[in-house]
Amino acid sequence: MKVFINTLIADLFLKLYTSVGWIVSYKEQVERALENTLALFMAYEDDKPVGMVRILGDSGMSFYIKGFAVIPKYQGKGIGKLLISEVQNYILSIIDKDWSVSLELISTKEGVKFYKKNGFEERLCEWDGPGMFKMIKNISNLISD
């Protein structure tokens, strides 16, 4: 198994992204997202892309996992764990000594067990609220009277 950083192109991203059931409407949207990504990690087995993770963040206090996918037939083989490890090592390599930073994500229901096994904690707790998100759609064909 090999992991490469910052080698992901839109076509590979789309292949992996859709392999886990996610939908993207526009290749141009993916290209822009990749251009503005802090770091990209791609896992290969026998020169075949089998997993990826994209990292967003400010490089100082907060990092965010987005687009974490492993092709279903390769799940359960340690690829996700390897990618999480690579992400953590990358973050440690760019932050100053003694800094603490947050690594955050929104999990699917099916992914909660995996993330807990890899050291993540659920946000919903006594002293903090749940993680939240909102989808925003630009509707250019909207006619208003």
Residues covered by each model-derived region:
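Conserved active-site alpha-helix within GNAT-family acetyltransferase domains
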Residues: 93-134
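Active-site beta-strand termini and strand-to-loop segments that position acidic
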Residues: 44-46, 135-137
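Conserved acetyl-CoA pyrophosphate-binding loop and the N-cap/start of the following alpha-helix
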Residues: 74, 78-86
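Conserved beta-strand in the GNAT
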Residues: 42, 48-57, 61-64, 69
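Small/polar loops that bind or transfer phosphate-bearing groups
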Residues: 5, 66, 106-107
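Active-site rim helix/loop that mediates acceptor-substrate recognition in acyltransferases
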Residues: 18-40, 45
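Short amphipathic alpha-helix that is part of the acyltransferase structural core
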Residues: 1-28, 145
